Amino acid sequence: MRVIIQRVSQASVTVEGQKTADIQKGLLVLVGIEDADTQEDIDWLTGKIIKMRIFGDENDVMNCSVQDVDGDIIVVSQFTLHASTKKGNRPSYIKAAKPDFAIPMYENFVKSLEKEFGKKIQTGIFGADMKVNLLNDGPVTIVMDSKNRE
C-alpha cells in the first residue's frame, strides 16, 4: 500500500460538480492499493499517519500531529501510485489492485483511520474522476510504502 501524505491549509474533492470533501488545516492522503496488501499494512500506515508530527508547535518546529492541531483528513484513492514506468512511455498499472479487492481494502483503511483518529475522515469517491484542489502547506509531502518501511 502506498500513500502520499500532504500537509494542507485547505483541500477539497469534487466529483461531477459536487463537493464530496472539504477541509481546512489537515492532511490530504492519496492511497494506492496492490493485491499483496493486508490488514497489517493498513494498521501500520494508519498509526504512522495519525501520529506523524509534521505540524508546527508554538515555536514552529514540526512537533505536532494532525490530532494535536485538531486538523482534518481527506483520503483519496489513487491507483496510479502503483504505476510502473520501467518499459516504454505509457505507465503500466498492473500492480494496482482490481476494484473487487481494492474497494474493501480502501474502506477498511478509512475505517481504521477514523477509529484511530476519533473523527470522521472525508473521502473522494473510489474509481471516480475526481478534481482534487489543495493548498499545500510548506510544502510538506511524505511518501510511504508499507512494503518498504523506511
Swiss-Prot record:
| EC category name | hydrolase
Q: Where is this motif: Gly-cisPro motif, important for rejection of L-amino acids?
A: 138-139
Where in or outside the cell it occurs: the entry states: Cytoplasm
Give the protein name, as stated in the record. Answer: D-aminoacyl-tRNA deacylase
Documented EC number(s): 3.1.1.96
Reactions that this protein is recorded to catalyse: glycyl-tRNA(Ala) + H2O = tRNA(Ala) + glycine + H(+); a D-aminoacyl-tRNA + H2O = a tRNA + a D-alpha-amino acid + H(+)
Q: Which organism is it from?
A: Flavobacterium johnsoniae (strain ATCC 17061 / DSM 2064 / JCM 8514 / BCRC 14874 / CCUG 350202 / NBRC 14942 / NCIMB 11054 / UW101)
Record note on quaternary structure? Homodimer.
Domain-related comment: A Gly-cisPro motif from one monomer fits into the active site of the other monomer to allow specific chiral rejection of L-amino acids.
Swiss-Prot/TrEMBL keywords: Cytoplasm, Hydrolase, RNA-binding, tRNA-binding
Q: Which family does it belong to?
A: Belongs to the DTD family.
